[in-house]
């Protein structure tokens, strides 16, 4: 996995001073690395009867859509308010300084459908915890929350269902 980790660029002082941002765009732009990353994650779910991959705006769309394609599953978008055209279920959640809201179509997941939730990076876990609540409210069965990478020192895993978190890479 080191070959994939080494492609991810560190950007110091972004988005603010003191933060070292893990820039995944370098991995996404490198076709062999992107393919390897998707293949490695998808392999974990082969034979698990995944119906949908729930993806989180915006970088989660890239990873989750490729993953859904490999698994023969549908894609369900989770977006910021006002971006989805039909009836939505919304969830407001707390951030370090304030709150945010996400929406999902109310008819996107049928009761009992087996889903994975995919995003690029697990940091504090706040966004993913909100998405877990949304999927459960719609009746979806969460197989796992999966990430390309996890920033372990931020402890986001603790906010998610125990035993249902997978990260390909850890920092």
UniProtKB/Swiss-Prot annotation:
<dbReference type="InterPro" id="IPR000836">
    <property type="entry name" value="PRibTrfase_dom"/>
</dbReference>
<comment type="subunit">
    <text>Homodimer.</text>
</comment>
<dbReference type="GO" id="GO:0003999">
    <property type="term" value="F:adenine phosphoribosyltransferase activity"/>
</dbReference>
<dbReference type="GO" id="GO:0044209">
    <property type="term" value="P:AMP salvage"/>
</dbReference>
<dbReference type="InterPro" id="IPR029057">
    <property type="entry name" value="PRTase-like"/>
</dbReference>
<dbReference type="GO" id="GO:0006166">
    <property type="term" value="P:purine ribonucleoside salvage"/>
</dbReference>
<dbReference type="GO" id="GO:0006168">
    <property type="term" value="P:adenine salvage"/>
</dbReference>
<comment type="function">
    <text>Catalyzes a salvage reaction resulting in the formation of AMP, that is energically less costly than de novo synthesis.</text>
</comment>
<keyword id="KW-0660">Purine salvage</keyword>
<dbReference type="GO" id="GO:0016208">
    <property type="term" value="F:AMP binding"/>
</dbReference>
<dbReference type="GO" id="GO:0005737">
    <property type="term" value="C:cytoplasm"/>
</dbReference>
<keyword id="KW-0963">Cytoplasm</keyword>
<comment type="similarity">
    <text>Belongs to the purine/pyrimidine phosphoribosyltransferase family.</text>
</comment>
<dbReference type="InterPro" id="IPR050054">
    <property type="entry name" value="UPRTase/APRTase"/>
</dbReference>
<keyword id="KW-0328">Glycosyltransferase</keyword>
<comment type="pathway">
    <text>Purine metabolism; AMP biosynthesis via salvage pathway; AMP from adenine: step 1/1.</text>
</comment>
<keyword id="KW-0808">Transferase</keyword>
<dbReference type="Pfam" id="PF00156">
    <property type="entry name" value="Pribosyltran"/>
</dbReference>
<dbReference type="GO" id="GO:0002055">
    <property type="term" value="F:adenine binding"/>
</dbReference>
<dbReference type="InterPro" id="IPR005764">
    <property type="entry name" value="Ade_phspho_trans"/>
</dbReference>
<protein>
    <recommendedName>
        <fullName>Adenine phosphoribosyltransferase</fullName>
        <ecNumber>2.4.2.7</ecNumber>
    </recommendedName>
</protein>
């Amino acid at each position: 996995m080191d070959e994939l980790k080494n492609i991810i660029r560190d950007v110091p002082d972004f988005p603010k001073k003191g933060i070292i941002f893990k820039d995944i765009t370098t991995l996404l732009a490198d076709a062999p690395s992107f393919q390897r990353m998707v293949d490695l994650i998808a392999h974990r779910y082969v034979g698990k009867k995944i119906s949908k991959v729930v993806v989180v705006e915006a970088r989660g769309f890239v990873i989750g859509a490729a993953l859904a394609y490999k698994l023969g599953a549908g894609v369900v978008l989770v977006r910021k308010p006002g971006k989805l055209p039909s009836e939505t279920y919304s969830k407001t959640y707390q951030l370090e300084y304030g709150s945010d809201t996400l929406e999902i179509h109310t008819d996107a997941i049928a009761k009992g459908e087996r889903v994975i939730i995919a995003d690029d990076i697990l940091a504090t876990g706040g966004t993913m915890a909100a998405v877990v609540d949304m999927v459960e409210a719609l009746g979806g069965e969460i197989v796992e929350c999966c990430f390309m990478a996890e920033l372990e020192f931020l402890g986001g895993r603790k906010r998610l269902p125990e035993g249902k978190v997978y990260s390909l890479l850890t920092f």
